[in-house]
């Protein structure tokens, strides 16, 4: 039973995750709309981009613009938890979006109710404050689920991120004394998001600052087969999105409904064999059994892993309870040299 089935690689119409990092005067929103319109129209003649706004309604400022107006708009309000971003993205997908802008994705990290606030409010079992790496464990797990969901979305995503100075402490030689001293240097700009966010992106652009440089960018990440579209020093236009659509359209189409079913099957299998077969026997799933059969080995592997993990967790919890009882008894019972061990 193979966990991974290997076959000849095919260039499929993978979803593009485009990240744009910039200051408030870099023109991120307008530039995102230009790309989104070019991409949406290139994918479908009557295509329209969707914009999910977290900036107190500022995303609607271009609603009547002669060039980029007419897009679909929705507002996501606090709390900016990963789960609410997942819900908002899901709502756009259900509404038929092919291309979605999120302005700004930074709020999931540092906005009201975002990951930083979640980590800072983490408590111990006794109600005390957690600190250090421990407090980040569960919040980062929730963030990872959002990124996993984003990577499997059926839409192309343009994510606007706020920028901040990338400051670093370095050793620098003091020529007057011949000694090294600690100095803070500015390495440029970085995004207000989790530090590994870039790894999940197809393309990452750092927007230039200043009204006279709106739309100009520096390429921070771009795969080789898209470098003819994105070049440092270029200015974003609707043609940028159209070129991206052309690249997508030249690749093999994906069966979106089958992919959605496969992802649902994997999610069900991740809850164990029993939950998977409940999903497998749903009346909406049964007609697709033949199409889903090639994925059955993977479903089985995932459900087995889930059941094994659950069994280990149950055993660990039982051992923990037993240990706690033994420790409690050892504190109250008198020490007997002839019988030092206290057993259940």
Where are the language model's segments positioned?
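Amphipathic alpha-helical transducer elements in NTP-driven molecular machines
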Residues: 29, 78-86, 130-152, 186-198
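Phosphate-binding/switch region of NTP-binding enzymes
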Residues: 23, 144-239
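Interfaces that engage single-stranded nucleic acids at replication/repair/recombination sites
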Residues: 1-28, 32-33, 37, 49-50, ...
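Structural motif
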Residues: 19, 99-101, 158-159
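Conserved inter-motif catalytic segment of the P-loop NTP-binding fold
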Residues: 23, 43-141
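Acidic surface patches and DE-rich sequence motifs
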Residues: 77, 124, 172-174, 212, ...
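Conserved catalytic network of the ASCE P-loop NTPase/AAA+ motor domain
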Residues: 11-12, 37-45, 91-95, 149-153, ...
């Amino acid at each position: 039973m193979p966990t991974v089935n290997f076959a000849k690689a095919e260039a499929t119409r993978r979803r593009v995750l485009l990240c744009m990092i910039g200051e408030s005067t870099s023109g991120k929103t307008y530039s995102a709309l230009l790309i989104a319109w070019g991409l949406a129209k290139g994918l479908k003649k009557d295509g329209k981009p969707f914009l999910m706004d977290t900036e107190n309604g500022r995303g609607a400022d271009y609603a009547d613009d002669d060039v980029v107006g007419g897009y679909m708009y929705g507002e996501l309000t606090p709390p900016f938890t990963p789960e609410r971003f997942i819900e908002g993205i899901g709502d756009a997908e259900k509404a038929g979006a092919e291309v979605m802008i999120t302005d700004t994705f930074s709020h999931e990290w540092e906005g009201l109710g975002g990951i930083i606030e979640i980590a800072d409010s983490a408590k111990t079992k006794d109600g005390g404050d957690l600190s250090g790496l421990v407090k980040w464990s569960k919040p980062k797990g929730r963030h990872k689920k959002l990124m996993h969901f984003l990577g499997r979305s059926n839409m192309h995503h343009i994510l606007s991120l706020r920028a901040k100075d990338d400051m670093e402490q370095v050793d620098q030689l003091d020529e007057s004394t011949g000694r090294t001293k600690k100095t803070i240097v500015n390495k440029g700009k970085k995004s207000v998001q989790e530090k590994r966010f870039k790894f999940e992106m197809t393309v990452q652009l750092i927007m230039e600052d200043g009204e006279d440089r709106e739309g100009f960018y520096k390429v921070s990440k771009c795969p080789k087969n898209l470098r003819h579209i994105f070049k440092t020093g270029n200015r974003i236009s609707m043609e940028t999105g159209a070129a991206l659509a052309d690249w997508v359209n030249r690749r093999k189409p994906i069966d979106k409904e089958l992919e959605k079913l496969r992802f649902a099957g994997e999610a069900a299998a991740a809850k164990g064999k029993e939950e998977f077969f409940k999903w497998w026997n749903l009346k909406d799933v049964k007609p697709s059994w033949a199409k889903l059969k090639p994925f059955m080995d993977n479903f089985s592997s995932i459900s087995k892993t889930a059941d094994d993990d659950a069994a280990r967790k149950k055993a660990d919890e039982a051992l923990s309870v037993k240990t706690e009882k033994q420790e409690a008894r050892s504190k109250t019972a008198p020490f007997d040299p002839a019988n030092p061990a206290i057993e259940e």
